Regions:
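Flexible loop linkers connecting adjacent transmembrane helices
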Residues: 29-34, 57-82, 107, 137-140, ...
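Extracellular/periplasmic helix-exit of transmembrane alpha-helices
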Residues: 53-65, 208-218, 236-265
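Hydrophobic alpha-helical segments and their helix-loop junctions in multi-pass secondary transporters
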Residues: 128, 150-176, 185-206, 364-372, ...
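Gly/Ser-rich helix-loop-strand patches that form or flank binding pockets
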Residues: 456-459, 569-614
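Small/aliphatic-rich secondary-structure junction motif
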Residues: 468-523, 527, 543-545, 549-552
Length: 614
């Protein structure tokens, strides 16, 4: 295979991740920074991009080498309360990111079609089902779609800057020199939070596992190198887009002394200042493209985080609807109460929230990639460790500084609510500080404390042991047994095996991989979960073959197990289908699905539902 074809095979994950670096939240912080401070904060963009390349590379390396995403590694390493706390913080970050996408899409619809902001916010719920339908076309189509949106954004801003004229290069050069004060700290940290997103670290470590990497050290090294190239190209492209937004704001607004307090204001001012009505149109198209591209990756990140931390697989449409609802409620309330100015402030706040979540993703990532037992020969070298810890230290210091300034401002503006605000902030800030200390110093805690606090959940799939040994004997030719890798498998196999012995039948064991990576990449998936499942099924086959039972294993990758079970049953035409019942009812049926109920309505062969063996 040629070098370019190999690079293309690994390309993709970083581009899906990079769209999060160009979402509407970036627009708010970049426009604010350029309009208020000119080119002064360009250095923050450059620094943030370098930090992003470093951290995303470490995230990709963790996934490639350990075959674990960041959420799974946290679940394995930390005690359950700490793991749950990290999950909650990550969900808050995803909701904050989605909030920016909701507001960005609503503003874009308002600019392009004059749809009221509140109506636009509510309309953004529709993209949930539309984009989830789009994922059915396959991962390469999704990647092409996202790249098309990125290209649209880049072209729109290139045209805007062409109309604005050439920037003064000496001013741009001075903007790359670091300079920070209490006046621009809030925006600087907002840019940092908008550029380096915590949930992208979880997403990248999972997406890289969807390529068939191989087991050898040489194959993993090749994958790491190609992913470094992929990340560098994709994230530098995002840097150019963000820099274009800030430079445009500096050229058009800062030099005229115009303070931008909302994105709509920036769009409306572009037409008279640049002398063409197309300026506002291109601005709106780019903003809409930005929000829609980020929506796709936000859904994927949410699924990966929930699966990794909690080992819970929620239906994709429900997961997307849940995240979007959490984002729509505050957006709708702010639009209703404060109008356009309120949406702009909420956009900035969402990016600061993202920045404050960063230490809780970055520090565990550094610990895991510094761990020789986990990473082997791919453990971080001394200079990488120094850069990584310097990055983490900078993030923590800036966020502590921001927290102090923010709390001071909140207390000064609280008036009669000051006492209640203090009462609420003290436990929250104390809890966050203790959590940060735990994840920072966990590897050097006393051994007795680490033993007490060991994670109670093993990494990957919790596979029951000895499913097919010493089976009870409860009564065709072809018997289909769908499995789900739980203790219910034993009950279904027991009944099916007893019938196979009596009738000389052959068992067909079907397992449908439905993880988020399996949904997107199908048979190309090579995650630790898939490999553990293969080992699990082969062990069952060996146990059954020792009992002289003919057996065949079938593994499919699909979004919904129900359709795949029915599809394979129609191909096989078995005499009997034996399934283990999960016992869900009510709310759990809505969240996790009702596989048996859906299958029994579509199958045209006998179905035996096994509830358990006493």
């Amino acid at each position: 295979m040629s070098l370019w074809r190999r690079m293309f095979a690994f390309a993709g994950p970083a581009y899906l991740v990079s769209v999060g670096y160009m979402d509407p939240g970036n627009w708010a912080t970049d426009l604010e920074g350029g309009a208020r401070f000119g080119y002064q904060l360009l250095w923050v963009l450059v620094l943030s991009n370098l930090m992003a390349i470093l951290l995303q590379t470490l995230s990709a390396r963790l996934g490639i080498v350990s075959q674990r995403d960041l959420a799974q590694a946290c679940r394995e390493t930390y005690p359950r309360p700490v793991s749950y706390a990290l999950w909650v913080l990550c969900e808050i970050a995803i909701a904050a990111c989605d909030l920016a996408e909701v507001l960005g899409a609503a503003i874009a619809l308002n600019l392009l079609f004059h749809i009221p902001l509140l109506t636009g916010v509510l309309l953004t719920a529709a993209d949930t089902l539309l984009l989830l339908w789009f994922t059915r076309l396959g991962i390469r189509v999704i990647e092409a779609f996202v790249l098309s949106l990125i290209a649209i954004i880049a072209v729109c801003f290139a045209i805007e800057i062409f109309w604005a004229g050439s920037p003064i290069l000496s001013d741009v050069a001075r903007g790359v020199i670091p300079h920070l004060s209490s006046h621009n700290l809030y925006i600087a940290i907002g840019i940092l939070g908008a550029t380096v997103m915590p949930h992208n670290l979880y997403l990248h470590s999972a997406l890289v596992q969807t390529r068939r990497i191989g087991k050898s050290a040489k194959e993993k090294l090749t994958a790491c190198r190609f992913n470094l190239i992929d990340s560098t190209i994709a994230l530098n492209g995002a840097l150019l887009v963000n820099a274009a937004i800030l430079v445009l704001a500096a050229m058009v607004f800062f030099k005229r002394g115009i303070v931008v307090t909302e994105i709509q204001q920036a769009s409306h001012l572009l037409t008279p200042l640049l002398g063409t009505t197309f300026a506002s149109i291109f601005f709106g198209v780019a903003l809409l493209s930005s929000g829609q591209s980020s929506t796709l990756t936000g859904t994927m990140a949410g699924q990966i985080v929930m699966e990794g931390f909690l080992n819970i697989r929620m239906r994709p449409w429900l997961r997307r609807l849940m995240t979007r609802t959490i984002a729509i409620i505050p957006a709708a309330l702010v639009v209703y109460a404060a109008g356009e100015t309120g949406t702009y402030k909420l956009l900035l706040l969402s990016q600061v929230i993202l920045s404050m979540q960063l230490p809780f993703a970055v520090i565990p990532l550094i610990h895991f990639t510094n761990n020789k037992q986990r990473m082997g020969k791919f453990v971080n070298r001394a200079w990488v460790q120094a850069l990584a810890w310097s990055t983490a230290a900078l993030i923590v210091v800036l966020n502590v500084w921001l927290a102090i300034l923010s709390v001071r401002d909140w207390l000064n503006d609280a008036g009669g609510w000051r006492g209640r605000l203090e009462l609420g902030l003290v436990p929250i800030l104390t809890g966050l500080a203790l959590l940060l200390l735990w994840v920072t110093f966990h590897p050097v805690l006393p051994l007795w404390l680490r033993k007490v606090a060991r994670a109670s959940v093993e990494l990957g799939v919790d596979l029951p042991a000895a499913v097919a040994e010493n089976l009870p004997s409860p009564i065709y030719r072809k018997i289909l047994v769908p499995l789900d890798h739980t203790s219910r498998d034993r009950d279904a196999i027991a009944h099916a095996a007893a019938m196979a012995k009596q009738h000389g039948a052959k068992l067909y064991l079907l397992h449908v991989e439905e993880g988020v990576t399996s949904q997107l990449f199908g048979p190309l998936s090579s995650t630790a979960e898939v490999e553990a499942g293969d080992q699990y099924l082969h062990q069952i086959i060996r146990d059954l073959e020792t009992q002289q039972i003919a057996v065949e294993m079938v593994v499919r990758h699909a979004r919904t197990p129900t359709k795949e079970i029915v599809r394979y049953a129609e191909e096989l035409n078995p005499d009997l289908v034996v399934m283990g019942a999960h016992g869900h009812k009510g709310l759990k049926d809505i969240v996790f699905g009702t596989t048996i109920n859906a299958v029994r309505h579509k199958l045209k062969v006998p179905l035996l539902i096994v509830r358990g063996i006493k």
